[in-house]
Protein backbone atom coordinates (compact mmCIF):
# COMPACT_ATOMS: atom_id res chain seq x y z
CA UNK A 1 0.00 0.00 0.00
CA UNK A 2 1.06 3.58 -0.64
CA UNK A 3 1.03 4.48 3.06
CA UNK A 4 3.40 1.63 3.91
CA UNK A 5 5.77 2.65 1.11
CA UNK A 6 5.66 6.27 2.26
CA UNK A 7 6.33 5.25 5.86
CA UNK A 8 9.29 3.13 4.78
CA UNK A 9 10.72 6.00 2.73
CA UNK A 10 10.45 8.40 5.67
CA UNK A 11 11.98 5.85 8.04
CA UNK A 12 14.96 5.38 5.73
CA UNK A 13 15.29 9.15 5.34
CA UNK A 14 15.30 9.60 9.12
CA UNK A 15 17.81 6.81 9.73
CA UNK A 16 20.25 7.32 6.85
CA UNK A 17 19.56 10.70 5.26
CA UNK A 18 18.54 8.94 2.03
CA UNK A 19 16.69 8.83 -0.28
CA UNK A 20 16.35 12.51 -1.04
CA UNK A 21 12.74 13.03 -2.07
CA UNK A 22 11.68 15.40 -4.84
CA UNK A 23 8.25 15.68 -6.42
CA UNK A 24 8.50 15.72 -10.21
CA UNK A 25 5.00 17.08 -10.90
CA UNK A 26 5.49 20.11 -8.67
CA UNK A 27 8.86 20.77 -10.32
CA UNK A 28 7.30 20.77 -13.79
CA UNK A 29 4.33 22.90 -12.76
CA UNK A 30 6.62 25.61 -11.38
CA UNK A 31 9.44 25.33 -13.94
CA UNK A 32 10.12 28.63 -15.74
CA UNK A 33 11.15 26.52 -18.75
CA UNK A 34 8.06 24.33 -19.06
CA UNK A 35 7.57 25.62 -22.62
CA UNK A 36 10.71 23.86 -23.91
CA UNK A 37 10.70 20.49 -22.22
CA UNK A 38 10.00 18.21 -19.30
CA UNK A 39 11.94 17.80 -16.08
CA UNK A 40 12.51 14.06 -15.90
CA UNK A 41 14.98 13.95 -13.03
CA UNK A 42 17.17 15.95 -10.70
CA UNK A 43 20.84 15.87 -9.87
CA UNK A 44 22.16 13.85 -6.94
CA UNK A 45 21.59 16.60 -4.38
CA UNK A 46 18.15 17.55 -5.80
CA UNK A 47 18.77 21.31 -5.86
CA UNK A 48 18.69 21.35 -9.66
CA UNK A 49 15.52 20.64 -11.65
CA UNK A 50 16.09 21.32 -15.35
CA UNK A 51 14.50 19.92 -18.48
CA UNK A 52 16.37 17.22 -20.40
CA UNK A 53 15.90 15.38 -23.69
CA UNK A 54 17.84 13.26 -26.17
CA UNK A 55 19.47 16.45 -27.46
CA UNK A 56 20.09 18.14 -24.13
CA UNK A 57 21.83 17.17 -20.90
CA UNK A 58 21.04 19.66 -18.16
CA UNK A 59 23.96 21.66 -16.80
CA UNK A 60 23.90 24.26 -14.05
CA UNK A 61 26.67 26.53 -12.80
CA UNK A 62 26.54 27.06 -9.04
CA UNK A 63 27.74 29.64 -6.56
CA UNK A 64 26.98 30.16 -2.88
CA UNK A 65 26.86 33.32 -0.78
CA UNK A 66 28.85 33.05 2.45
CA UNK A 67 26.07 34.38 4.66
CA UNK A 68 28.11 35.00 7.86
CA UNK A 69 30.34 37.36 5.86
CA UNK A 70 27.25 39.44 5.13
CA UNK A 71 26.15 39.90 8.73
CA UNK A 72 26.84 43.19 10.49
CA UNK A 73 26.13 43.48 14.21
CA UNK A 74 23.71 40.58 14.00
CA UNK A 75 21.80 42.01 11.02
CA UNK A 76 21.96 41.00 7.36
CA UNK A 77 23.79 43.66 5.33
CA UNK A 78 21.51 43.86 2.29
CA UNK A 79 23.75 46.22 0.35
CA UNK A 80 26.68 43.85 0.69
CA UNK A 81 24.47 40.94 -0.39
CA UNK A 82 23.42 42.97 -3.42
CA UNK A 83 27.04 43.63 -4.43
CA UNK A 84 28.06 40.01 -3.93
CA UNK A 85 25.11 38.52 -5.81
CA UNK A 86 25.47 40.99 -8.68
CA UNK A 87 29.14 40.12 -9.12
CA UNK A 88 28.51 36.39 -8.69
CA UNK A 89 25.77 36.31 -11.35
CA UNK A 90 28.09 37.97 -13.86
CA UNK A 91 30.85 35.47 -13.10
CA UNK A 92 28.50 32.48 -13.33
CA UNK A 93 27.20 33.73 -16.66
CA UNK A 94 30.80 34.01 -17.87
CA UNK A 95 31.41 30.40 -16.86
CA UNK A 96 28.75 29.25 -19.32
CA UNK A 97 30.74 30.68 -22.24
CA UNK A 98 34.26 29.73 -21.18
CA UNK A 99 33.47 26.29 -19.75
CA UNK A 100 34.79 23.03 -21.19
CA UNK A 101 32.02 20.68 -22.31
CA UNK A 102 32.81 16.99 -22.63
CA UNK A 103 29.67 16.30 -24.70
CA UNK A 104 27.78 18.46 -27.20
CA UNK A 105 24.42 17.74 -25.59
CA UNK A 106 25.57 19.45 -22.39
CA UNK A 107 26.92 22.42 -24.35
CA UNK A 108 23.68 22.74 -26.32
CA UNK A 109 21.62 22.82 -23.15
CA UNK A 110 23.83 25.25 -21.27
CA UNK A 111 24.10 27.76 -24.12
CA UNK A 112 20.42 27.54 -24.99
CA UNK A 113 19.00 28.06 -21.50
CA UNK A 114 22.00 29.52 -19.58
CA UNK A 115 20.89 28.36 -16.11
CA UNK A 116 22.88 29.42 -13.06
CA UNK A 117 22.27 28.71 -9.40
CA UNK A 118 22.91 31.20 -6.60
CA UNK A 119 22.65 29.65 -3.17
CA UNK A 120 24.09 30.19 0.26
CA UNK A 121 26.06 28.55 3.02
CA UNK A 122 26.54 29.30 6.70
CA UNK A 123 22.86 29.82 7.49
CA UNK A 124 23.30 28.24 10.92
CA UNK A 125 26.31 30.52 11.56
CA UNK A 126 24.15 33.54 10.80
CA UNK A 127 21.63 32.31 13.37
CA UNK A 128 24.41 31.82 15.93
CA UNK A 129 25.43 35.44 15.35
CA UNK A 130 21.90 36.47 16.31
CA UNK A 131 21.62 34.02 19.23
CA UNK A 132 18.61 32.61 17.41
CA UNK A 133 17.64 28.93 17.76
CA UNK A 134 17.31 27.08 14.47
CA UNK A 135 13.89 25.76 15.51
CA UNK A 136 12.19 29.10 16.17
CA UNK A 137 9.84 31.57 14.52
CA UNK A 138 12.68 34.10 14.42
CA UNK A 139 14.78 31.68 12.37
CA UNK A 140 11.91 31.17 9.93
CA UNK A 141 11.53 34.92 9.59
CA UNK A 142 15.27 35.33 8.96
CA UNK A 143 15.14 32.56 6.36
CA UNK A 144 12.30 34.34 4.56
CA UNK A 145 14.03 37.70 4.56
CA UNK A 146 17.53 36.48 3.64
CA UNK A 147 16.24 34.31 0.78
CA UNK A 148 14.05 37.14 -0.46
CA UNK A 149 17.08 39.43 -0.66
CA UNK A 150 19.26 36.88 -2.48
CA UNK A 151 16.46 35.95 -4.89
CA UNK A 152 15.56 39.57 -5.61
CA UNK A 153 19.08 40.67 -6.47
CA UNK A 154 19.85 37.48 -8.40
CA UNK A 155 16.87 38.14 -10.68
CA UNK A 156 17.78 41.83 -10.94
CA UNK A 157 21.39 40.98 -11.84
CA UNK A 158 20.30 38.52 -14.54
CA UNK A 159 17.96 41.12 -15.99
CA UNK A 160 20.80 43.67 -16.01
CA UNK A 161 22.92 41.16 -17.92
CA UNK A 162 20.08 40.59 -20.38
CA UNK A 163 20.01 44.31 -21.10
CA UNK A 164 23.79 44.28 -21.61
CA UNK A 165 24.30 40.93 -23.37
CA UNK A 166 20.86 39.85 -24.57
CA UNK A 167 18.30 37.37 -23.26
CA UNK A 168 18.97 33.64 -23.26
CA UNK A 169 17.90 31.95 -26.54
CA UNK A 170 14.86 30.10 -25.15
CA UNK A 171 13.53 33.08 -23.19
CA UNK A 172 10.40 33.69 -25.29
CA UNK A 173 7.51 31.68 -23.91
CA UNK A 174 9.09 31.14 -20.49
CA UNK A 175 7.32 32.07 -17.27
CA UNK A 176 9.79 34.95 -17.01
CA UNK A 177 8.50 36.37 -20.30
CA UNK A 178 4.96 36.15 -18.92
CA UNK A 179 5.86 38.14 -15.83
CA UNK A 180 5.68 35.08 -13.57
CA UNK A 181 8.56 34.81 -11.10
CA UNK A 182 9.46 31.63 -9.18
CA UNK A 183 7.82 33.07 -6.06
CA UNK A 184 4.66 33.66 -8.11
CA UNK A 185 4.56 30.16 -9.56
CA UNK A 186 3.36 28.80 -6.24
CA UNK A 187 -0.05 30.09 -7.36
CA UNK A 188 0.13 27.66 -10.30
CA UNK A 189 0.80 24.85 -7.85
CA UNK A 190 -2.02 26.09 -5.64
CA UNK A 191 -4.53 25.96 -8.49
CA UNK A 192 -3.40 22.43 -9.32
CA UNK A 193 -3.23 21.03 -5.79
CA UNK A 194 -5.67 23.14 -3.78
CA UNK A 195 -5.08 26.09 -1.47
CA UNK A 196 -5.55 24.03 1.71
CA UNK A 197 -2.15 22.42 1.12
CA UNK A 198 -0.22 25.65 0.56
CA UNK A 199 -0.66 27.80 3.62
CA UNK A 200 2.64 29.68 3.38
CA UNK A 201 3.74 33.20 4.23
CA UNK A 202 3.92 35.27 1.04
CA UNK A 203 4.75 38.63 2.61
CA UNK A 204 7.29 40.85 0.85
CA UNK A 205 9.74 43.52 1.99
CA UNK A 206 11.16 44.52 -1.42
CA UNK A 207 9.59 46.14 -4.48
CA UNK A 208 8.80 43.08 -6.58
CA UNK A 209 6.40 44.93 -8.88
CA UNK A 210 9.22 47.22 -9.97
CA UNK A 211 11.43 44.18 -10.64
CA UNK A 212 8.69 42.49 -12.68
CA UNK A 213 8.42 45.61 -14.81
CA UNK A 214 12.19 45.60 -15.31
CA UNK A 215 12.22 41.94 -16.39
CA UNK A 216 9.30 42.55 -18.74
CA UNK A 217 11.30 45.35 -20.35
CA UNK A 218 14.84 43.91 -20.36
CA UNK A 219 14.24 40.15 -20.12
CA UNK A 220 16.45 37.59 -18.37
CA UNK A 221 19.96 36.42 -19.21
CA UNK A 222 19.50 33.11 -17.39
CA UNK A 223 16.59 30.66 -17.30
CA UNK A 224 17.26 29.81 -13.64
CA UNK A 225 19.08 31.85 -11.04
CA UNK A 226 18.61 30.10 -7.67
CA UNK A 227 19.78 26.74 -6.31
CA UNK A 228 20.49 25.77 -2.71
CA UNK A 229 23.40 23.36 -2.96
CA UNK A 230 24.60 21.24 0.00
CA UNK A 231 28.05 22.96 -0.04
CA UNK A 232 29.50 19.99 1.87
CA UNK A 233 33.08 20.67 0.76
CA UNK A 234 33.29 24.42 0.18
CA UNK A 235 31.65 25.18 3.53
CA UNK A 236 34.38 23.20 5.31
CA UNK A 237 37.05 24.99 3.29
CA UNK A 238 35.64 28.39 4.27
CA UNK A 239 34.93 27.33 7.86
CA UNK A 240 31.15 27.76 7.95
CA UNK A 241 28.18 25.45 8.39
CA UNK A 242 26.81 23.61 5.40
CA UNK A 243 24.21 25.31 3.21
CA UNK A 244 20.94 25.93 5.09
CA UNK A 245 21.48 22.91 7.35
CA UNK A 246 21.51 23.01 11.15
CA UNK A 247 24.55 21.87 13.10
CA UNK A 248 23.93 18.15 13.48
CA UNK A 249 26.96 17.55 15.69
CA UNK A 250 29.18 19.91 17.62
CA UNK A 251 32.19 17.71 16.95
CA UNK A 252 32.68 15.21 14.16
CA UNK A 253 35.33 13.77 11.88
CA UNK A 254 35.16 14.35 8.14
CA UNK A 255 36.99 12.15 5.65
CA UNK A 256 38.14 12.86 2.10
CA UNK A 257 40.96 11.83 -0.21
CA UNK A 258 43.41 13.91 1.82
CA UNK A 259 42.61 12.05 5.04
CA UNK A 260 40.54 12.77 8.14
CA UNK A 261 40.10 16.03 10.00
CA UNK A 262 38.03 17.11 12.98
CA UNK A 263 35.27 19.72 12.67
CA UNK A 264 34.38 21.60 15.87
CA UNK A 265 31.55 24.08 16.40
CA UNK A 266 33.48 27.34 16.99
CA UNK A 267 30.44 29.12 18.45
CA UNK A 268 30.14 26.45 21.13
CA UNK A 269 33.82 26.90 21.97
CA UNK A 270 33.35 30.67 22.34
CA UNK A 271 30.30 30.20 24.56
CA UNK A 272 32.12 27.72 26.78
CA UNK A 273 35.13 30.04 27.04
CA UNK A 274 32.81 32.90 28.02
CA UNK A 275 31.43 30.68 30.80
CA UNK A 276 34.94 29.62 31.86
CA UNK A 277 34.06 26.02 31.02
CA UNK A 278 36.54 25.43 28.21
CA UNK A 279 39.27 23.21 29.64
CA UNK A 280 40.90 19.83 29.05
CA UNK A 281 38.09 18.03 30.88
CA UNK A 282 35.46 19.66 28.65
CA UNK A 283 37.43 18.78 25.52
CA UNK A 284 37.65 15.15 26.60
CA UNK A 285 33.95 15.08 27.51
CA UNK A 286 32.99 16.43 24.09
CA UNK A 287 35.14 13.80 22.42
CA UNK A 288 33.74 11.02 24.60
CA UNK A 289 30.11 12.00 23.99
CA UNK A 290 30.78 12.71 20.30
CA UNK A 291 29.87 16.39 20.57
CA UNK A 292 26.60 15.86 22.43
CA UNK A 293 25.95 18.31 25.28
CA UNK A 294 23.08 16.47 26.95
CA UNK A 295 25.38 14.18 28.94
CA UNK A 296 27.67 16.95 30.21
CA UNK A 297 26.13 18.21 33.46
CA UNK A 298 28.53 21.16 33.77
CA UNK A 299 26.91 22.89 30.81
CA UNK A 300 23.87 25.00 31.83
CA UNK A 301 20.55 24.23 30.12
CA UNK A 302 20.25 27.67 28.56
List PLM regions with ranges.
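Long, C-terminal-biased catalytic regions of enzyme "large/alpha" subunits
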Residues: 1-302
Amino acid sequence: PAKDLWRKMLTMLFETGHPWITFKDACNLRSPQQHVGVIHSSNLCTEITLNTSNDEIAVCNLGSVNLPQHMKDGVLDQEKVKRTVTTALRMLDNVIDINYYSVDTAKNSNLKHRPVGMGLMGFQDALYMQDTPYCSDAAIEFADRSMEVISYYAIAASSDLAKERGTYPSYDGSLWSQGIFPKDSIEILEKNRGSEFLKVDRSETLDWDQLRAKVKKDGMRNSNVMAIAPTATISNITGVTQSIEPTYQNLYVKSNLSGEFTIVNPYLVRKLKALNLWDDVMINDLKYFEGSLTEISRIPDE
